[in-house]
């Protein structure tokens, strides 16, 4: 499995892994002994003590309890779908309108993986069983806060390509014009954090990582913040036709930041059971898109200006040919020779969008028994963007099922 993660992220992950591996040593070191401690072990012991105290600070023990065993490991399965939809509009010289819509998705995919953590601090890794890509996640949850970090990657060679052509008399749609010779690669980074105003009686961790156990029903107002960054690349030379139809754009990067307030409730219908629901409307105060444009070279000659000078005429002829039922040979000229196009990066245009709204919705069902627990939960997010080149949105939903064991 290949997950393209930056060097900084790799070091961050390695540091978290090292810290988690050192915690058992710190626990052993804290059990006794008067000799001089190794500075690394001493530092890990300090972190362990801090985590232990933060996990239960200020909680009402009649509502929330802490498991005796601090470590937890779980096997996870995940059903998910991420959909990225991009539009590019073309007002033609004839007065007609053309729209290119690219919808790429990882499909209804299933991931399998594992997670390990200590008192609500842990990381997990999942692999897509039906295709490329996977998910790397890290979480930190205390008595009154929760932080989630996730990197997700996938690629698709079979996006839904829709070319729409409108005139005064009719509308013409051509779906799935062709599969791509090179896949569209999508990578997303997701970071969110929450603060619970009723952390004394309500536990977010009890619903989403089981480092605490909710004993009685309780709810809480919440404040939250979210950061989302995603990129889509389809700039391979084999995709030159798609890049041309997207107005020369072969790579997009989206960055969004939101803040919000909402409410969450933990319902305890019977001993060991917990049902959680959370809804948080969010104000999107930062929303930018960077569009990377490309130049088209043929045998070393820059043909970009010639292509786009005659763009309207060429596109109109293609659309009229499709609407008349003409056969599109695609990838060859009239002589039958292959068309060799090389894409070279030209420039980048960054647009800052208007303030908008999105929401974060989550639902979880948990059952605890002895040192075991079973959890099923899901969430949904939508992110929008627009610029002078086009507009679109990203939809993401996930449903997880986890079987965990405390030790």
What are these regions (language model features)?
Residues 86-100, 112, 120-122, 146, ...:
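Outer membrane beta-barrel transmembrane domains
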Residues 75, 112-118, 136-142, 191-197, ...:
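Residues on the lipid-exposed face of transmembrane beta-strands in outer-membrane beta-barrel proteins
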Residues 39, 67-73, 110, 119-121, ...:
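Outer-envelope beta-barrel architecture signal
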């Amino acid at each position: 499995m290949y997950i393209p993660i930056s060097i900084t992220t790799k070091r961050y992950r390695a540091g978290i892994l090292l810290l988690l591996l050192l915690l058992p040593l710190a626990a052993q070191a804290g059990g006794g002994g008067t000799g001089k401690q190794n500075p690394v072990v001493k530092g890990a012991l300090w972190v362990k003590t801090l985590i232990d105290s933060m996990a239960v600070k200020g909680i009402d023990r009649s509502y929330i309890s802490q498991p005796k065993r601090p470590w937890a490991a779980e096997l996870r399965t995940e059903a998910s779908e991420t959909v990225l939809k991009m539009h590019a509009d073309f007002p033609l010289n004839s007065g007609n309108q053309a729209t290119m819509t690219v919808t790429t998705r990882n499909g209804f995919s299933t991931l399998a993986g594992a997670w390990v953590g200590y008192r609500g601090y842990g990381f997990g890794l999942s692999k897509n069983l039906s295709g490329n890509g996977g998910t790397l996640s890290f979480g930190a949850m205390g008595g009154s806060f929760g932080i989630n970090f996730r990197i997700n990657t996938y690629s698709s060679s079979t996006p839904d390509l829709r070319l729409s052509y409108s005139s005064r008399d009719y509308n013409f749609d051509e779906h799935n014009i062709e599969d791509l010779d090179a896949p569209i690669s999508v990578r997303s980074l997701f970071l969110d954090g929450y603060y619970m105003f009723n952390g004394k009686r309500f536990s977010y961790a009890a619903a989403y990582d089981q480092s605490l156990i909710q004993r009685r029903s309780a709810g809480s107002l919440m404040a939250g913040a979210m950061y989302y960054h995603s990129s889509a690349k389809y700039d391979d030379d084999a995709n030159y036709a798609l890049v041309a139809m997207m107005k020369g754009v072969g790579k997009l990067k989206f960055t969004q930041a939101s803040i919000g307030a909402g409410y969450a409730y933990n319902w305890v219908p019977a001993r060991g059971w917990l049902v959680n629901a959370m809804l948080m409307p969010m104000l999107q105060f930062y929303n930018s898109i960077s569009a990377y444009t490309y130049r088209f070279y043929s045998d070393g000659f820059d043909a970009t200006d010639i292509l786009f000078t005659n763009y309207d005429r060429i596109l109109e002829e293609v659309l009229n040919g499709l609407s008349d039922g003409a056969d599109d040979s695609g990838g060859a000229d009239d002589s039958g020779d292959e068309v060799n196009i090389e894409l070279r990066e030209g420039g980048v245009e960054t647009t800052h969008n208007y303030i908008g709204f999105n929401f974060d919705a989550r639902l979880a069902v948990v059952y605890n028994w002895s040192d075991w627990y079973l959890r099923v939960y899901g969430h949904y997010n939508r992110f929008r963007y627009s610029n002078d080149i086009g507009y679109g949105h990203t939809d993401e939903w996930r449903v997880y099922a986890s079987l965990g064991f405390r030790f």
